[in-house]
Amino acid sequence: MEGHSNTSVILHTYQQQQPQQLISSIIPQTLSDGYGISAPISQADCSGNSNFVNTNPWNNTTFQAYQTDAQFTNEISVLNYPNVYDDFSKESSNGILSDPSLHGSNSSSSTSDVGSSVDCSISPEPILMPSVKRGRPTENPCWAYFHRIDDQLVKCRLCTKVVRSACATNMTKHLERHHADDYQKVTGQLKLFRMNDVGIRSKMHYEVADNPLSTLPVVTNSYILPKMEPMDTFDPSQYYGMQQDPTLNQQQFIQFEQPQASIDPQTWPLTHFWQNTAQTNIMSHLGEASTSTLGSSVIQEAHKMNPDSNDKSFQLDLEQQNCVIIEQKLDDKPRVTKPTTKPYQKRNRKTEHPVWAFFKRTGDGNAECIICQGVVKSPCSSNFMRHLMRHHSTEYNDVYLKWIEKRNITHPGIHCTSVPPPAFINNETSRTEQTTFSVK
């Protein structure tokens, strides 16, 4: 028999599932047709047709006597060979992709010739790609100083230190801490790269002329004062709806009507304002000497605009008045000198609470009890009174009475204390003390 029959192809494909000794007993040589006449199975020549299984699949008519067998039904008889392996994601320890048939993959067929019975599970050659995290190139120049170990680690080429969480920020910080000169180079290169990148992108979207500088004439001081043409006459009725008052002094508008020709038209409103109001309104408002820089600057500008006045005498009078006022203000303010020997004191006033008679300050900012040498932190009268109330009841009662008596003298009718009154043992004593020092 030339070539390979379809039975041999099926048996070779399922050679791992079916033992070899059962082939002759399972496959018969003759089959009975519908009329009860047995006829031999025709042996087709498959040597010249490699797609025999796909073009002439076996069906239920061919294997009517063996439909009860689970291994030779029509479902498993039709061979569908996939073109791509589905288990190529596994890698071996040496970094080479392994064959999926070695891992027990379900895709045991291959893309080789089905008609050949030599091998039906030949895997293609694996292609190893470099470990690239992103498709775009790295634009930061700091990558030139580092060698990538994996997706999370890089090694510095200068000091061979490993930097985790490989990104441009961490690598730039490493250069900044350990390689200052190279860090300056990297920052300069990065700025230059970004400037060039921005220039290229702007040229792509906008047309930039070769000479971008404007040749329009620039008027000096045009942005300081608006351009105003000199007015020939000033008529208030043009701007305000008012009636003419016969009692109004018309001499106030003479200088508005005839401005000086020597004055620059651009600065004419400002100079006109100074000439009319500098000596009348501002000097009357600044009759008293001013110690602020604003007042002195206004006075200087007023004298500059009116040089005909007696500048020297007026300026001397202002300076003398300023000196007198400054001396008076300094004398009125009490001069406070910070103590240098006791830096822990927060206030310069004397402690008025009588509880301080039982405590003294320590060098660390706390206080020490004179009776029991106990240290009280955060020294204040409330903490001292609580210490006496817990540990020295007799002294606490005395201090409390002294404090109430002193408060009655300085602040009559007002008793502000965060410490409770003493608990007297004798009821009669408590009554007498309560009648003597009644708290309203």
Swiss-Prot record:
Could you tell me the keywords of this UniProt record? Answer: Metal-binding, Repeat, Zinc, Zinc-finger
Do you know which InterPro entries this protein is assigned to?
Cuticle_assoc_protein, Znf_BED, Znf_C2H2_sf
Q: Per the record, GO CC terms?
A: nucleus
For the ligand (Zn(2+) 2), the binding residues are 369, 372, 387, 392
**From which residue to which do the BED-type zinc fingers run?**
137-186, 350-399
One GO process term, biological-process aspect:
regulation of transcription by RNA polymerase II
Statement: the UniProt record of this protein carries the keyword Transmembrane: no
Region called Disordered, residue ranges: 96-119
Q: Which domain of life is it from?
A: Eukaryota
Q: Pfam families given for it? A: zf-BED (PF02892)
GO MF terms here are: sequence-specific double-stranded DNA binding; zinc ion binding
- Per UniProt, where does Zn(2+) 1 bind? 156, 159, 174, 179
Organism this protein belongs to: Caenorhabditis elegans
Protein name stated in the entry: Protein dumpy-20
Q: Which stretches does UniProt call biased (Low complexity)?
A: 98-119
Q: What does this protein do?
A: May be directly or indirectly involved in cuticle function.
